[in-house]
Amino acid sequence: MAIRLIRSMYFAIISKQRNGKEDFNMSKYLVVVDMQKDFIDGSLGTKEAQTIVPKVIEKVAEFKGPVMFTRDTHEENYLETQEGQNLPVEHCIRGTEGWELQPELNEYALKNHCLIFDKPTFGSTSLAGCVSGIARMAPIDQIELIGLCTDICVISNAILLKTALPDTEIIVDASCCAGVTPQSHKNALEAMKMCQITIVGE
């Protein structure tokens, strides 16, 4: 990712998300992973995903630092892709209702000019590139992740971020995450612990 683009993103975050907040902390970031309708109550929704929605909304609203979002994004040929052949359930097709962020979170993202990273696969290399570029200009002490699904996209992005920023604390709040199943959620948390990712909220 070009340094000039990263710099413009960085200053956009400062000027728009800070918005007069005296306690705004530019060294702590929150990444909200794939809080989209299809993963909540759509084609791949679960009751566990629905349960965490109020907690995620509350955490985002109260967070005193930059907030970024990822959005799982597929095209109409999804079923022809490798992922589509392994998981033949259409979901998060660009432009559909199921692709959109949960309404309150979408409103927050638009109002606060949050960066939204559309990603065609589990992890976002653009997200990792962006935050590592920002870290070259200003230190990032912590990056916290919340969202869906713990065992697929949360763990993928947590490990990408830990790889990009090995000396930054990467945190996952388990109480604001849900997996494909409760057991796979727990398995992913244990795997992340082994990769020196801090797990809170269990």
Show the residue positions of the predicted features.
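Short, Lys/Arg-enriched N-terminal segments with co-localized hydrophobic residues
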Residues: 7-25
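Active-site catalytic pocket residues across diverse enzymes, especially alpha/beta-hydrolases
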Residues: 109, 131-135, 164-165
